[in-house]
């Protein structure tokens, strides 16, 4: 009979950011170990608050499943002597399985023939499996920081106070430090401090709700949002949406209870971002705005308990915020006393990366690169703005405000640039060169910020790859994946037409003094190739979310030096592969590409010689190709890749007839090479859009 499993670790207040990852660890270890033990189960739910981490597994089987498995013994050669009698090795193997030698079988593997036996392995009782599993789960949580307490020879995020471990109505013995598991949990620290005895896991969630604890994170989050929005509406304002703050506050409380407070209106002359950051970072307060999005002198704080004396509580919240805003005003006033341009030299004392130099050196590189990109992208008229904004782009890193709130870099640069009399375009570019900060973030509204942002990120990518610190599957300390995706979004979003490989070359040229002596592993590709391959990987992942993988691969294999053109080719090809008649087209094109790949490298370059086309089908194909090539080239020049594909697909009848009627691999070398040369030229025509050999024809038929 299936029973439910409950594990709860009760502790002193666990940091909010630790709770989600810890629950993931608990769930992973428990489910993996149950799977390894073949212990079947139903739904798995997790619960987490500042005082508890819990996992509820429904419908756990009584025991692991029985299996029949094959066990290999000694090799057949070692198992029998020259007379065919079993050796000691065979006898010991049979004895270990409680079998006679003649009951053993033989199994053939890649390494040869071995003695074997099929034996039944009984599943272990659930209680035995879970006792070990829960011990491993509790001890296997990886906290960013952990602590020890008392004489306990173990560590956790915070001191563990109690453990619940139930399988049905039975307590499973689990020990963590000086705490032994039982069936007793605890409710809200202040509203329901008494112990709660659980008879079975199914009682857990309801029992805690009665004790003023919303243990389900999703439910608690929804409650928090609902209550905070209602409080904002009651105060005649709207909530400034902030998902990350909602997530954080959700895990700071067990029973969210919002209160609305105010601050002095005179502080509204500070940049709104400063006020929001002061309230969010230090106090975890929600900001309020009016219907037009203008910040209001109000906030919402979330308490862990319903407030009895709201005015007393508010005085505390407001007093703390008053001090924070005074600090913000001090930083803002002090920072404005020194113009940004006078701070630039100080960047020479701030290390960006040990081998790649200071922020001042980085600024000098990406300023030059940004101006170059502007020229290549047809934005040469923005050169003066780009140069000035790039010079000032990182100057706010050495201000007091950004030292206190790194999240405000760029934003404070914009404000201080305006205060110092810089043109609006320069101030805007300083702020916008950080955009997009994330996958869902908006792009810059103007070219200077976008081009500086591309240059800054490309300098980082090329520099880090050049010194051999490329991201791995486990680590990306310089956030190069995010930087690469941001560059792609910026180029495509702003429609910049420049050579990606040339941009990488220019960036590496500017980095040359810093990377000249960089050590690389033997056989490792050059930094240029590594960076371009990195872009290829990000494009494949990004485009693969919206398009078929084989179509993306076909487009990338034909080149992606012009990212805008590559995207247009992808969209055109994605449209045509969905047609029912594309499969025969794909088959015909792949025949061309396959022959070119196998035979084309053995044929000297040059164009097809029409005089050596002796058969009518090959002359017809050459005529059709010549006409299509001229038309396709014109269409590609104006980015009409759909039209180019229509022209290319028009070659199919001539290609089919050619393969049906003409022997490509003719005995006459001159004829053979001329025919292959014709196919090479046709393949090159195809390749202006995509490498059709990468497209799965069968998939195309089903599309």
From Swiss-Prot:
Record-listed E.C. numbers: 6.1.1.14
Record's catalysed reaction(s): tRNA(Gly) + glycine + ATP = glycyl-tRNA(Gly) + AMP + diphosphate
Top-rank lineage group of the source organism: Bacteria
EC main group: ligase
Localization, UniProt: Cytoplasm
InterPro entries, sorted: DALR_anticod-bd (IPR008909), Gly-tRNA-synth_bsu (IPR015944), Gly-tRNA-synth_heterodimer (IPR006194)
Keywords: Aminoacyl-tRNA synthetase, ATP-binding, Cytoplasm, Ligase, Nucleotide-binding, Protein biosynthesis
Gene Ontology annotations for the cellular component aspect, listed alphabetically: cytosol
Biological process, per Gene Ontology: arginyl-tRNA aminoacylation; glycyl-tRNA aminoacylation
PROSITE patterns associated with the record: AA_TRNA_LIGASE_II_GLYAB
One Pfam family per UniProt: tRNA_synt_2f
One MF term in the entry's GO annotations: ATP binding
Iron among keywords: no
Protein family: Belongs to the class-II aminoacyl-tRNA synthetase family.
NCBIfam families: glyS
Assembly description: Tetramer of two alpha and two beta subunits.
Name recorded for this polypeptide: Glycine--tRNA ligase beta subunit
Species the sequence originates in: Myxococcus xanthus (strain DK1622)
């Amino acid at each position: 009979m299936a029973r439910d499993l409950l594990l709860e670790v009760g502790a002193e207040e666990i940091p909010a950011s630790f709770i989600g990852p810890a629950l993931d660890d608990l769930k992973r270890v428990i489910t993996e170990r149950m799977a390894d033990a073949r212990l079947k189960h139903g739904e798995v739910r997790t619960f987490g608050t500042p005082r508890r981490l819990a996992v509820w597994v429904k419908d756990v089987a009584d025991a692991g499943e029985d299996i029949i498995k094959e066990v290999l013994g000694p090799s057949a050669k070692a198992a029998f002597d020259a007379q065919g009698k079993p050796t000691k090795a065979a006898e010991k193997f049979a004895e270990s399985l409680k079998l006679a030698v003649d009951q053993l079988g033989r199994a053939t593997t890649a390494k040869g023939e071995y003695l074997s036996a099929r034996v039944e392995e009984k599943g272990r009782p659930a209680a035995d499996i879970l006792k070990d599993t829960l011990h491993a789960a509790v001890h296997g949580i990886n906290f960013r920081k952990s602590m020890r307490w008392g004489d306990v020879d173990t560590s956790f995020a915070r001191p563990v106070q109690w453990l619940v471990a139930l399988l049905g109505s039975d307590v499973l013995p689990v020990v963590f430090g000086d705490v032994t598991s039982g069936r007793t949990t605890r409710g809200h620290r202040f509203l329901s401090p008494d112990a709660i005895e659980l008879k079975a896991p199914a009682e857990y969630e309801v029992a805690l709700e009665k004790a003023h604890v919303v243990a389900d994170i999703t439910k608690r989050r929804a409650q928090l949002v609902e209550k905070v929005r209602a409080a904002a509406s009651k105060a005649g304002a709207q909530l400034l949406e902030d998902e990350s703050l909602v997530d954080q506050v959700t895990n700071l409380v067990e029973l969210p209870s919002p209160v609305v407070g105010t601050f002095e209106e005179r502080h509204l002359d500070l940049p709104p971002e400063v006020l929001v950051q002061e309230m969010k970072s230090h106090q975890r307060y929600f900001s309020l705005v009016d219907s037009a999005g203008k910040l209001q002198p109000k906030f919402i704080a979330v308490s862990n308990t319903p407030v009895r004396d709201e005015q007393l509580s508010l005085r505390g919240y407001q007093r703390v915020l008053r001090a924070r805003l005074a600090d913000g005003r001090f930083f803002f006033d002090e920072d404005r006393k020194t113009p940004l341009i006078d701070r630039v030299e100080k960047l020479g004392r701030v290390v960006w990366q040990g081998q790649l130099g200071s922020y001042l050196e980085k600024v000098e590189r990406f300023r030059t690169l940004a101006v170059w990109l502007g020229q290549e992208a047809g934005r040469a008229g923005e050169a003066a703005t780009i140069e000035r904004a790039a010079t000032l782009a990182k100057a706010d890193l050495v201000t007091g405000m950004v030292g206190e709130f790194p999240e405000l870099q760029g934003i404070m640069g914009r404000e201080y640039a305006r205060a110092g009399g810089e043109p609006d375009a320069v101030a805007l570019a300083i702020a916008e060169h950080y955009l997009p900060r994330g996958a869902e973030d908006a792009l810059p509204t103007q070219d200077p910020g976008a081009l500086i942002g591309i240059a800054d990120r490309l300098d980082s990518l090329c520099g880090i790859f050049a010194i051999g610190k490329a991201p791995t599957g486990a680590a990306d300390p310089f956030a190069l994946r995010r930087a690469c995706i941001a560059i792609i979004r910026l180029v495509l979003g702003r429609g910049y037409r420049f050579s990606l490989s040339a941009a990488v070359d220019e960036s590496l040229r500017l980095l040359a003094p810093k990377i000249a002596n960089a050590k690389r592993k033997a056989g490792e590709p050059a930094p240029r190739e590594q960076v371009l391959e990195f872009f290829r990987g990000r494009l494949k992942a990004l485009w693969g979310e919206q398009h078929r993988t084989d179509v993306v691969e076909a487009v990338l294999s034909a080149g992606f030096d012009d990212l805008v053109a590559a995207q247009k080719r992808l969209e055109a090809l994605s449209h045509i592969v969905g047609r029912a008649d594309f499969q025969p087209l794909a088959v015909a094109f792949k025949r061309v590409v396959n022959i070119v790949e196998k035979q084309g490298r053995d044929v000297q370059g040059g164009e097809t010689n029409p005089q050596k086309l002796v058969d009518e089908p090959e002359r017809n194909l050459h005529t059709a190709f010549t006409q299509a090539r001229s038309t396709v080239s014109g269409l590609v020049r104006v980015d009409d890749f759909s039209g180019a594909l229509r022209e290319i697909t028009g070659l199919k009848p001539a290609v089919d007839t050619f393969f049906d009627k003409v022997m490509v691999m003719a005995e006459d070398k001159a004829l053979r090479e001329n025919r292959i040369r014709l196919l090479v030229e046709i393949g090159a025509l195809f390749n202006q859009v995509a490498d059709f050999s990468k497209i799965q024809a069968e998939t195309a038929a089903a599309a």
